[in-house]
Amino acid sequence: MKTISKYILLAAVSLSFTSCKKFLDREPIAQITPDNIFNSQQGAQSAVMGMYRTQLGANSYGQSLIIVPEFSARHVNHVSSFPEYVDFKTNTIRIDNPWVQNIWTAGYAAINAANNIVVKVAAMPEAAIATDKRQQFIREAQFIRALTYFNLVRAFGEVPLIVTPTGENDNLKVPRNTVAEVYAKIIADLIEASNLPNVYANIAETKGRVTGNAAKALLAKVYLYNGAVTNTYAEAARLAKDVIATSGASMPVDFGSVWTTKNTSESIFELQFDAQATNPLATVSNPNASALFYAEGKSIADLYEAGDKRRDFTIYQNTPADPRFYIGKYRIFNPAIQNVPVIRIAEIYLIHAEAQARLDGGVSAASYDSYKKVRDRAGITTPDISTFTTLAAFITAVQKEKRKEMMFEGEAWFDYCRTGLALTDMMTKADPNYYLYPVPDAERRNNPTLTQNKGY
């Protein structure tokens, strides 16, 4: 594994001072050093904001974590059909694929930023930081660490589980941990993060920050993904139901407003982009400039039923003369300050629908109502509950609904791999080995203890 320098944290902290005015007053950047970041509460808070900024880059939610799985799901194209993108669609990913490397490297950079906070904030003297802020900062870092490991374990399977800070001179030779070990740490971190406040001092402080409800929502998703192995569907259903009932989140009538308006009632955790930290994916989705990515056309449109309000927002043609369809969820280009909703209530309804059905052994009124809620917002009629004669039929319907609801959000590929639906509905090579991406070759050269995934 490539070593992750403490200067990654310092760079992120410096950016947080220039662009996170809502969270803290700025300190002269020249006064920030790796040694003094954790000497004061303000310094620790700046490290937390820097950690959030690790999620915004082109190798994270600013592009890779969304667009790469969408290539795997065969939802998008690249204007030049570069092999490093096309290989995801054809399940022929090379071990030196740069986007696989980028996801791995950016993931461990974010984890290192979180580890620094968890370990070093815990070690700060009592006089340097208030007790409530110490707990808050650590729990925020635990959430980001859990979110990042969840993304990595879905992409690569077994990954090294590193929970202490690493420095520029560290020569790590860390083997891969089992999937079960990684999930256990994700769950432990999220259980602790669920103790975060649901509302901070004011709205400005709450926007973009992890809350207790965000941790519970992500934990429900984690339990759903891990449920086939650990039978945690009851926990997934319970947490999803709790978030639906108590978070105050709701689905706006206008589906498109979730992306054209920042921090709507639908959002549970939303990454904040601004003029200093613009959204790379929105920038390269602009059909009036140099769009790099565009949507598959008819194959995507045909997934939606007649009258589905989501279709014409999710994909669109820029002009009648332009045959391409574009990604509608990232259309705020000038400037590209569009936020990214990482967790939203519509997904939680669908998590509840599936988990509750699995728990009940078949579709029930509770699971059906959650499924119907999402379809009602889309303006389409839901088949009668009696039409779902088997559990499998209902789960497939829920997953297909999630695919339409969360198109171009980086979710459908992982969700379909989770149940095997990807084999028939997405994959060019119907081989479960290719549910996972290859461990980057550069990482294996640097760290010979890393094994490669089957099929690569």
Predicted features and spans:
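Sec-dependent bacterial lipoprotein signal peptides
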Residues: M1-S19
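Short, surface-exposed recognition loops and adjoining beta-strand edges that mediate ligand/DNA contacts
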Residues: P34-D35, G62-S81, I162, N198-T283, ...
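Membrane-proximal, proline-rich intrinsically disordered regions
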Residues: T3, C20-I67, I93-D96, T424-Y456
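Conserved, well-structured interaction surfaces
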Residues: Q45, R53, P83-F156, S194-N202, ...
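Hydrophobic-face positions in mid-chain alpha helices that act as interaction patches
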Residues: V86, E235-I345, G420, Y437-D441, ...
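Long, intrinsically disordered, low-complexity segments
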Residues: K185, P280-A282, F293-A295, T314, ...
